Structure formats: structure tokens, C-alpha cells
Amino acid sequence: NFYADYSGCGHWRMIWPELLLNCYGKANIQGGTVMIGDRNFYKGLKTIRIQRQATESQLNYIKWLKTVQEECGFKIIYEIDDLIFKEDIPFYNKFRFAFEDPSIRQTSMEIMQICDEITVTNNFMKEYYIEKTGNKNVTVIPNFIPKFWMDRYYDLNQIKENYQRHKSKPRVVYCGSGAHFDIENNVKQKDDFFHVNDVIRKTVDKFQWVFVGGFPLCLRDLVQQKKIEYHEWNNLVDYPKA
């Protein structure tokens, strides 16, 4: 496994599956970010999985791996859990800048085209990357939450108690990426919450709206007034408890 990052998707798409497969003895997987140039390292490998590689140096590395592949016979799989072509990344997304260079689009496209398989998270992305890259060997592997991350917080009695306590004012929680908010006001708040912000404002006394890690800037006044509950970003270890 070659990771693109050590943040959220790096864990639940690469690191945690690798850990569990190794722990259960289902596979012997090594992971990291270093491009290993020793051909002997790849002897006996069945699969090399690369996550969201996009730079010219990474393309050259994959091309070199293709020459080693002829000798060793392993598969090369490209893992991607998001859209990385800039024409389809919203202007409000704070990470868009990382993919604005046309060369990034070209190199990531070429890498995906020469890989034996692409893995994605859902059918929409499967059809998207088939259409964009022409590589028809795209497999859907949904995101799965590992039990060791969340299971100790599942308590049926507590769930029933919470329901009784909050049923007069149900809690509605958003705990996704802050990239869905126009935090730099690039498009005048026309982000992923633009179409529901008015509903949230109008129902703030009917529902307890809860945001984790970020919130629509146009609702800042409700956050400051404590009418919307807000919890700051947290690390992956403490995230379930937060």
C-alpha cells in the first residue's frame, strides 16, 4: 500500500483495512509513502495499491512499476475516494487549489489509465471514472467503519434514553468534512448547505441542529447564540467520543 495521506481517508481506505487483514492473517500487507526503487522488493507480491497519486514523479514511479510488473506479475490498483479533476471540484472546496495545476490532471489521468484496476467508494464514482479515464475495470469498495473505532459507543439502552430525552426536539447532526462549507467565501456561500440553510434557520427551535468540525458561515450568529450546537474538529482517536 502506498498512501496519499495519513488523515481520514488514509485510515479508513488504506491503513485500517491493512491492519485488520494483517491481524486476522488474511494477508501480509506493508504500507507507507516511500517509493521503493529496489526491484527485488516486489518479487512475490500479488498487488500494489496506490492511493490518489497525481504528481509527475509519482507517474514516473508507476511507469517504472509497470516494467517491474512484467517480471513479477503483480496487479497495480489505484484507490480514489473523491473527485480530483478540477472541472468537477466546487470552487468553495478549500482543497481545490491542490488540483488546479493542469499537469496534476494530466498525470493523475495517465496513472489511472495505466493501472490494472481502480477502486472507488460508490457507483456514482465508478461511472464517473470509467467515463473520465476510459479504464473500465473499476470496483466499488464502500467505506466501512471498523468496530474497534466505534463499537464501544453503541449502547442500546443509552440510545433509548437519548430518544426519550430529545424526542420533543430531535437532534440532527452533521459531522462530515469542512470542505463542504464555503469558509473563504469564494462563491458567496453557495456551497453544499446553501439549499438548506434557510430551513435550518427556520427550524432552529424545532430541531437541535448539531455541527461537528465546521458549519455554514451564514449561520454563525446561531452558533454564537448557542441555538446551533457546535463541536470543533477532533482527531480520529477522540472523534467517536466527541
Residue ranges and their predicted role:
Residues 34-36, 122-126, 212-219:
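Short, polar loop motifs at secondary-structure junctions
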Residues 1-55:
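N-terminal pre-catalytic "stem/leader" segment of glycosyltransferase-like enzymes
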Residues 124, 141-144:
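Carbohydrate-associated surface elements
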Residues 5, 78-105, 148-153, 166-168, ...:
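Acceptor-binding helix/loop patch of EC 2.4 sugar-transfer enzymes
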Residues 51-70, 79-80, 85-87, 187-189:
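An aromatic- and histidine-rich active-site surface loop
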Residues 113, 235-242:
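Short acidic alpha-helix that forms the nucleotide-activated donor recognition element
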Residues 67, 71, 97-118:
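Membrane-proximal helix-turn-helix segments that form the acceptor-binding/catalytic region
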Residues 5-20, 144-237:
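Conserved catalytic-core segment of nucleotide-activated headgroup transferases in glycan assembly
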